[in-house]
Curated annotation (Swiss-Prot):
The lineage of its organism: Bacteria, Pseudomonadati, Pseudomonadota, Gammaproteobacteria, Pasteurellales. The gene is atpA. It catalyses: ATP + H2O + 4 H(+)(in) = ADP + phosphate + 5 H(+)(out). One of its GO terms (cellular component) is plasma membrane. Produces ATP from ADP in the presence of a proton gradient across the membrane. The alpha chain is a regulatory subunit. It is a peripheral membrane protein. Gene3D superfamilies: 2.40.30.20, ATP synthase alpha/beta chain, C-terminal domain, P-loop containing nucleotide triphosphate hydrolases. Its EC number is 7.1.2.2. This is ATP synthase subunit alpha. It is an enzyme of class 7 (translocase). F-type ATPases have 2 components, CF(1) - the catalytic core - and CF(0) - the membrane proton channel. CF(1) has five subunits: alpha(3), beta(3), gamma(1), delta(1), epsilon(1). CF(0) has three main subunits: a(1), b(2) and c(9-12). The alpha and beta chains form an alternating ring which encloses part of the gamma chain. CF(1) is attached to CF(0) by a central stalk formed by the gamma and epsilon chains, while a peripheral stalk is formed by the delta and b chains.
Length: 513
């Protein structure tokens, strides 16, 4: 078939009209040095602070130092396959992690990728890891409790929804155990949990996941793992990634609890990155912005008001407040709470639970020191029953500690002093609690009622644990409906007081332990 010149001309014009050229401008640069997980890049003149830089290996680096003629970036993962001369390019976006209900029950890394071998995660979208915390106007005061299930914590240092309560102590004093038990106790409360493991052994994280699964709490929990074998960049970013996952629930009018285990290791990872980037070191070789590192993270834990939730969800959720409660963990060296990072985090949080190695070694577990443990806002959130009945506990323990110090030197003590010492010993014994055995509000109320109204006076010290077990068994068996109702309401009035009195009177009259 022959085409004449007119047809050829028309065909060419048609093809030209259909021809579509898309030009794409990309900001590229060249790696000039690679060392210890840090790369220096020449070029990238338009890169943003914190921007993701695409590497030729398929991984990403994060721009942290923007200098006059080069960019210092930290590699998100292994860096041994990178070399000088490789070309990299800007992505125009900052780090985002997947968020949503699909992450519940899963173990993910800092980037939100599954590492538990259970297949892909169906997420509801992505959220930036760095988000500005809610403002003053968007917040609401803390007045709802987060029950940890520990008598010592819920009675003396109560935690409210939206609070930041620091758990601080030396290594091997039960910090993680307390946080894990708090997560386990939320399995029926509707509070979603996020556990962020920073710089821990992979075997330790696996053990935590197994315990959560055994106790039926994993289905309600997201585990974000940045183990000791991960790069410093992933350890530094893990708490922010976990926080973004928790904010998904907070901003939709739900309650979430996040545990950072622990922020000491995150600070060490950030110090490592900063020193490798040649930022000037300050006290204990930490960079000058280590306070801001933790404050911008912990300020994101808040209770937000109904308007905030309604605006965020564009009217889909109305009349609901959301909260993100944070339990950061800090490890001290030889009980030194005046070190740089511990003092920073103490000043940022709304109180601290101080765990003491001396108490732990003496068998007092949880090893809470009631003298210096405090909750600055949790009192308003405490359930009425526990608040009313726990008033004398802290005083009894304070008097006991003071008298016990003098009693070491005095041989003959008067009856009143002896009675106070005996009462203090029994209260200390009663506040001991096994791991993975959280108590309900009603169970705590029964025990605190026994302390407050002298039902322990004729019980021998070595029989306190048996007394408690038998009492709770009796109360749950004979007054099931009342116990369930009290746990649900947390109220305290004359009727409840009389019922509790009846339970204890009947128990003391009819039981031996």
């Amino acid at each position: 078939m022959q085409l004449n010149s007119t047809e050829i001309s028309e065909l060419i014009k048609k093809r030209i009209a259909q021809f579509d050229v898309v030009s794409e401008a990309r900001n590229t640069g060249t790696i000039v040095s690679v060392s210890d997980g840090i790369i220096r890049i020449h070029g990238l003149s338009e890169v943003m602070q914190g921007e993701m830089i695409a590497l030729p290996t398929g991984r990403f680096a994060m721009a942290l130092n923007l200098e006059r003629d080069s960019v210092g970036a930290v590699v998100m993962g292994p860096y041994t396959d990178l070399a000088e001369g490789m070309e990299v390019q800007c992505t125009g976006r900052i780090l985002e992690v997947p968020v949503g209900r699909g992450l519940l029950g899963r173990v993910v890394n800092t980037l939100g990728q599954p590492i538990d071998g259970k297949g892909e995660i169906k997420n509801d979208g992505f959220s930036p890891v760095e988000v500005i915390a809610p403002g003053v106007i968007d917040r609401k005061s803390v007045d709802q409790p987060v029950q940890t299930g520990y008598k010592a914590v819920d009675s003396m240092v109560p935690i409210g929804r939206g609070q930041r309560e620091l758990i601080i102590g030396d290594r091997q004093t039960g910090k993680t155990a307390l946080a894990i038990d708090a997560i386990i106790n939320q399995r029926d409360s509707g509070v979603k949990c996020i556990y962020v493991a920073v710089g821990q052994k992979a075997s330790t994280i696996a053990n935590v996941v197994r315990k959560l699964e055994e106790n039926g709490a994993l289905a309600n929990t997201i585990v974000v793992a940045a183990s000791a074998s991960e790069s410093a960049a992933l350890q530094y970013l893990a708490p922010y990634a976990g926080c973004a996952m928790g904010e998904y629930f907070r901003d939709r009018g739900e309650d979430a609890l996040i545990v950072y285990d622990d922020l000491s290791k995150q600070a060490v990872a950030y110090r490592q990155i900063s020193l490798l980037l040649r930022r000037p070191p300050g006290r204990e070789a930490y960079p000058g912005d280590v306070f801001y590192l933790h404050s911008r993270l912990l300020e994101r834990a808040a209770r937000v008001n109904e308007e905030y939730v309604e605006n965020f969800t564009k009217g889909e959720v109305k009349g609901k407040t959301g909260s993100l409660t944070a339990l950061p963990i800090i490890e001290t060296q030889a009980g030194d709470v005046s070190a740089f990072v511990p003092t920073n985090v103490i000043s940022i949080t709304d109180g601290q639970i101080f765990l003491e190695s001396n108490l732990f070694n003496a068998g007092v577990r949880p090893a809470v020191n009631p003298g210096i443990s405090v909750s600055r806002v949790g009192g308003a959130a405490q359930t009425k029953a526990v608040k009313k009945l726990a008033g004398g506990i802290r005083t009894a323990l304070a008097q006991y500690r003071e008298l016990a110090a003098f009693a070491q030197f005095a041989s003959d003590l008067d009856d009143a002093t002896r009675k106070q010492l005996s009462h203090g010993e029994k209260v200390t014994e009663l506040l001991k609690q096994k791991q993975y055995a959280p108590l309900s509000v009603a169970e705590q109320a029964v025990i605190l009622f026994a302390v407050e109204f002298g039902y322990l006076d004729d019980v021998e010290l070595n029989k306190i644990a048996d007394f408690e077990t038998a009492l709770l068994d009796y109360a749950n068996r004979t007054n099931t409906e009342f116990m369930q109702e009290l746990t649900k309401s947390g109220d305290y009035n004359d009727e409840i007081k009389n019922t509790l009195k009846g339970i204890l009177d009947n128990f003391k009259a009819n039981n031996t332990w």
